[in-house]
UniProtKB/Swiss-Prot annotation:
Name of the protein described by the UniProt record: Chaperone protein DnaK
TM stretches of this protein: none
Family of this protein: Belongs to the heat shock protein 70 family.
Organism for this UniProt entry: Thermoplasma volcanium (strain ATCC 51530 / DSM 4299 / JCM 9571 / NBRC 15438 / GSS1)
Compositionally biased region (Basic and acidic residues): 599-613
Bias (Low complexity): 581-597
Role this protein plays: Acts as a chaperone.
GO MF entries: ATP binding; ATP-dependent protein folding chaperone; unfolded protein binding
NCBIfam families: PRK00290.1 (NF001413), prok_dnaK (TIGR02350)
HAMAP family: DnaK (MF_00332)
Length: 613
């Protein structure tokens, strides 16, 4: 039975895991572990010759190819933003799909079997558009996405499996590269894992800290040299990499050296950056960012109807929670020390893998009850957002409410679905709109229109409206600008497959060029060693062909390479045959003389010779 893998599709780094023989195991990346601590950085790059790179190779070449490199695409999920790379445009779903495609390939290499099913995590505070975009990305990558689950819930699954026992109320503080989620979860003795509330900020994370460090370095340089390095994309990428490395180092050391030679060139010559960033300075820079975590913590406690003192465990998830200042700030605010035993960088992927094993029936003692993070409403008269499903409602869920018309003889109503906590529809996120037509004409207030919201286990919403008098029914598959149609998904799947085919062809090309180089070398060696056993005309002709082959290799002219390889192989084979026949003829002549000698000497004995060991 094939496995369902768990995927942590992160802003800065991504990881995957799988349950093998009941034990969650992180799937290694083909390039090894990145500095971020997860399997690989969430980078995608396109070279000028059309090659696509994902992960560490994409990150390594970012400085030389800033225009072709994309990172932090997750922050654009659920928007209509397009990444422009040279003469092409890509949606956030496509970029995420390329990352997921790499994970699929790594998982198949690790498990030695096809991997087609996945559980993918999202920040708990992702709205419906963002969740649907994530699911679309998985489909484009070739996955059957069995479940979309919240990252803190996944982390709690990892925790719950390891620490089943007495009932606990756990606050999961998940601070990743681009998002913050604060989730309060109750784990009972079974263990049941029930989400009580969730809150967060989809625009708060480690990348904001990196940006604060970048601004500090850039401002200092601008003050000294009068140049804003942030306007130079190549210099900016170097600054960003240096900032991230310093941030990571300062989790375990008190100072970090930043050394960026030749960061730019002016009329007076090359300019360099050489400075030391202390942990104290880092804490000063990130303090305004860290202070923003209080509001989501308070909101999560309010949603769960709990006080700080009700929390029995604090669980940290995400790379930035390794920063001592972040840990101390949250621990001091809640008045509780964080639990150990869960790797902040692996917990989400492991939890997703556990959920996959639950869906497969491999793990049977976990019941997961998640919640919808934001209130789902319809727009009613005056632009009011009328709630249908409140925030922190356990999912899956189906709820209905009856509405009526606002005007006499109204035969059409517009159902506008929004998500958020603001009282006016215009201030919330619009998820979609549709019309219910054919309503029986009647005075206003008489028709009864039943609107039903249905959220599945992935947290994805479907809405229907029914006129109770006529039975007329209309449904919606969310038509926000970021939702992809089936045709668009299929087109993007084909594009993703084309890149996979491109990778295969690139590998094939490299292997052919390597074989051609080996052939050129071995032929030259053979002809040189043959000496006068090969006539000069033949030798010169073949060496000329080898010269042409080397030129074709250099130019990567694959048609010429293949043609010349075939010709040279045939020619050298003929040379070899002639040399063998010549040697054989000489041997036979020698053998004839030996036979004559044998006939003359009756004492000669035929024997088999064994080589001395």
């Amino acid at each position: 039975m094939s496995k369902i893998i768990g995927i942590d599709l992160g802003t800065s780094n991504s990881a995957a895991a799988v349950v093998i023989s009941g034990k969650p195991t992180v799937i290694p990346s083909s390039e090894g572990v990145s500095i971020g601590g997860k399997a690989f950085p969430s980078y995608v790059a396109f070279t000028k010759d059309g090659q696509m790179l994902v992960g560490e190779p994409a990150r390594r070449q970012a400085l030389l190819n800033p225009e072709g490199t994309i990172f932090a695409a997750k922050r654009k999920m659920g928007t209509d933003y397009k990444f422009k790379v040279f003469d092409k445009e890509f949606t956030p779903q496509q970029i995420s799909a390329f990352i997921l495609q790499k994970i699929k390939k790594d998982a198949e290499a690790f498990l030695g079997e096809p991997v087609n099913e996945a559980v993918i995590t999202v920040p708990a505070y992702f709205n419906d558009n963002q969740r649907q975009a994530t699911k679309d990305a998985g489909t484009i990558a070739g996955f059957d996405v069995k479940r979309i689950i919240n990252e803190p819930t996944a982390a709690a699954l990892a925790y719950g499996v390891d620490k089943s026992g007495k009932s606990e109320k756990i606050l999961v503080f998940d601070l990743g590269g681009g998002t913050l989620d604060v989730t309060i979860i109750e784990i009972s003795k079974r263990p049941n894992v029930q989400v009580l509330s969730t809150s967060g900020d989809t625009q708060l994370g480690g990348t904001d800290m990196d940006e604060a460090i970048v601004n500090y370095i850039a401002d200092d340089f601008q003050k000294k040299e009068g140049i804003d390095l942030r306007k130079d994309r190549g210099a900016y990428i170097r600054l960003r990499d240096a900032a991230e490395k310093a941030k990571i180092e300062l989790s375990t050391t008190l100072s970090s050296d930043i050394d960026l030679p030749y960061i730019t060139v002016t009329s007076s010559g090359p300019k360099h950056i050489k400075m030391t960033l202390t942990r104290a300075k880092l804490e000063e820079l990130i303090s305004p960012i860290v202070e923003r975590v209080k509001a989501p913590i308070d909101k999560a406690l309010e949603g769960a109807k709990l006080k700080k003192t009700d929390i029995t465990k604090l669980l940290f998830v995400g790379g930035p929670t390794r920063i001592p200042y972040v840990r101390k700030y949250v621990e001091d605010y809640l008045g509780i020390k964080a639990e150990g035993g869960v790797d902040p960088m692996e917990a989400v992927a492991i939890g997703a893998a556990i959920q996959g094993a639950v869906l497969k029936g491999e793990i049977k003692d976990i019941v997961l009850l998640d919640v919808t993070p934001l209130t789902l409403s319809v727009e009613t008269l005056g632009g009011i957002a009328t709630p249908i499903i409140p925030a922190n409602t356990t999912i899956p869920v189906r709820k209905s409410q009856v509405f009526t018309t606002a005007e006499d003889m109204q035969t059409t109503v517009t159902i506008h679905v929004v998500q958020g906590e603001r009282p006016l529809a215009k201030d919330n996120v619009s998820l979609g709109m549709f019309n219910l037509t054919g309503i029986a004409p009647a005075p206003r207030g008489i028709p009864q229109i039943e609107v039903t919201f249905d959220i599945d286990s992935n947290g994805i919403l479907n809405v229907t409206a029914v006129d109770k008098a006529t039975g007329k029914k209309q449904g919606i598959t969310i038509t926000a600008s970021t939702k992809l149609s089936k045709d668009e998904i299929e087109r993007m799947k084909k594009e993703a497959e084309q890149y996979a085919e491109q990778d295969r062809k690139m590998k094939e090309q490299i292997e052919t060029l390597n074989n051609a180089e080996s052939l050129a070398y071995s032929v030259e060696k053979t002809l040189n060693e043959a000496g006068d056993k090969v006539d000069k005309e033949t030798k010169d002709r073949i060496l000329s062909e080898v010269k042409d082959l080397r030129k074709a290799i250099e130019e990567k002219n694959m048609d010429n390479v293949k043609t010349l390889m075939e010709k040279i192989s045939k020619d050298i084979q003929e040379v070899g045959t002639k040399m063998y026949q010549s040697a054989s003829s000489t041997t036979q002549t020698g053998s004839g003389n030996q036979n004559s000698s044998k006939q003359e000497n009756d004492k000669t004995v035929d024997a088999e010779y064994k080589e001395k060991s």
